[in-house]
């Protein structure tokens, strides 16, 4: 069977009912991505300065595919006689070991291979604890609004503070939620400190659909537009999702063709969810499993989830009250009264939750338990 595009090479993959050869499939996928990056075309570049974009790299198949496509675009601009590239690319890696210590062996040497494959980009690898350096407000937020007495033990390191905070949540959903907040705050703060024009998030349509369902389930529906939609974020930096028109399965096929030399460093997922007990499965895990299994049967339905969010009106951010934890304008969902409130968390303990939190963060903070380490 011949490819329906070039009508010459034999077809090797079926994409959305179309039989394509390897080259035509790669061109199809890359075109989808580049159309989502029209904002950053060379002809739209400012004359007086060079734009800079941040690409957070998780070593997953989606962010690696995005890195390959964007790096290839910039290389083509450099080698075709053009005097400049459309932008400079700064790749940010939050050290996987600082998030999941069990990944230590798998993470070894991966950045060196990435630099060898794409040497023209700028690279930074930072641990999660560097959030204290880039986001000076985070220390006060942890101390003042979660009850962890940081000031009583000044000898405690940033890593100890962060580990204590993350370990204080009693459920897998709360831990995953707070890790997501910390990661976003770190990436945004890092990008702003380096005067970047935007962030290229490597989220596929499948990932965005799972995030949408998970955020609604967690009570974060009011902030959906800033989690899955392109545009200016409340933090004065542009969010771009170049992979939003592509399914995770399509990116996996693309990686098998275009990233043959990097297959060994790609984080393989999904995890075997059947081996996880309910206690260790977060809402994010559950929604990812649902989208991956049902998306194979009904891809159009999964795509409509993200398209529906695109139709939502972006809430105004001027003079909006900001949640002290996730820093999202919460509007009417924010209880701005002074003081704090008492409630019963999922662990059965009475928990003090600051009133200046949005509904989603309030639910997460209710799952906090008392710190188990010595407070000094």
UniProtKB/Swiss-Prot annotation:
> What's the superkingdom here?
Eukaryota
What is the source species?
Coccidioides immitis (strain RS) (Valley fever fungus)
Q: Family per UniProt?
A: Belongs to the CTU2/NCS2 family.
This chain belongs to the protein called Cytoplasmic tRNA 2-thiolation protein 2
Cellular component terms (Gene Ontology): cytosol
Compartments it resides in: Cytoplasm
Q: Which GO terms describe its biological process?
A: protein urmylation; tRNA thio-modification; tRNA wobble position uridine thiolation; tRNA wobble uridine modification
What keywords sit in the KW lines?
Answer: Cytoplasm, tRNA processing
What is the protein's known function?
A: Plays a central role in 2-thiolation of mcm(5)S(2)U at tRNA wobble positions of tRNA(Lys), tRNA(Glu) and tRNA(Gln). May act by forming a heterodimer with NCS6 that ligates sulfur from thiocarboxylated URM1 onto the uridine of tRNAs at wobble position. Prior mcm(5) tRNA modification by the elongator complex is required for 2-thiolation. May also be involved in protein urmylation.
GO molecular function terms listed in the Swiss-Prot or TrEMBL record:
nucleotidyltransferase activity; sulfurtransferase activity; tRNA binding
Q: Does the keyword Chloroplast apply?
A: no
Q: List the disulfide bonds.
A: none
* One Pfam assignment: CTU2
Question: Where does this protein chiefly localize?
Answer: cytoplasm
The record's gene field reads: NCS2
**To which pathway does this protein belong?**
tRNA modification; 5-methoxycarbonylmethyl-2-thiouridine-tRNA biosynthesis
Q: Which HAMAP family match?
A: CTU2
């Amino acid at each position: 069977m011949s490819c329906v595009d070039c009508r010459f090479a034999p077809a090797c993959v079926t994409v959305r009912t179309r039989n394509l050869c390897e080259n035509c499939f790669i061109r199809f996928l890359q075109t989808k991505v580049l159309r989502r990056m029209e904002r950053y075309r060379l002809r739209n570049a400012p004359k007086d300065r060079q734009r800079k974009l941040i690409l957070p790299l998780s070593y997953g198949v989606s962010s690696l595919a995005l890195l390959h496509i964007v790096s290839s675009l910039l290389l083509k601009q450099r080698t075709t006689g053009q005097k400049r590239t459309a932008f400079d690319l700064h790749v940010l890696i939050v050290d996987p070991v600082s998030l999941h210590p069990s990944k230590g062996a798998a993470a070894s040497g991966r950045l060196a291979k990435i630099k060898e494959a794409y040497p023209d980009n700028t690279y930074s690898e930072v641990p999660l604890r560097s959030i204290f350096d880039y986001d000076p407000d985070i220390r006060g937020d942890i101390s003042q609004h979660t009850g962890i007495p940081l000031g009583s033990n000044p000898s405690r390191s940033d890593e100890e503070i962060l580990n204590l905070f993350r370990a204080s949540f009693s459920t897998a959903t709360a831990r995953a939620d707070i890790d997501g907040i910390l990661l976003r705050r770190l990436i945004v703060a890092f990008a702003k400190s380096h005067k970047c024009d935007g962030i290229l998030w490597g989220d596929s349509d499948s990932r965005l659909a799972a995030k949408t369902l998970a955020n609604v389930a967690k009570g974060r529906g009011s902030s959906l537009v800033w989690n899955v939609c392109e545009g200016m974020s409340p933090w004065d930096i542009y969010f771009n999702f170049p992979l939003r028109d592509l399914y995770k399965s399509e990116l996996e096929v693309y990686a098998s063709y275009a990233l043959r030399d990097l297959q060994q460093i790609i984080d393989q997922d999904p995890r075997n969810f059947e081996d996880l007990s309910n206690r260790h499965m977060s809402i994010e895990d559950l929604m990812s499993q649902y989208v991956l299994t049902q998306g194979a049967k009904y891809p159009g339905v999964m795509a409509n989830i993200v398209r529906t969010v695109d139709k939502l009106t972006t809430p105004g951010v001027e003079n909006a009250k900001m949640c002290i934890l996730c820093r999202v304008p919460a509007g009417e969902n924010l209880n701005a009264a002074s003081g704090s409130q008492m409630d019963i968390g999922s662990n059965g303990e009475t928990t003090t939750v600051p009133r200046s939190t949005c509904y989603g963060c309030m639910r997460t903070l209710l799952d906090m338990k008392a710190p188990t380490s010595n407070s000094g």
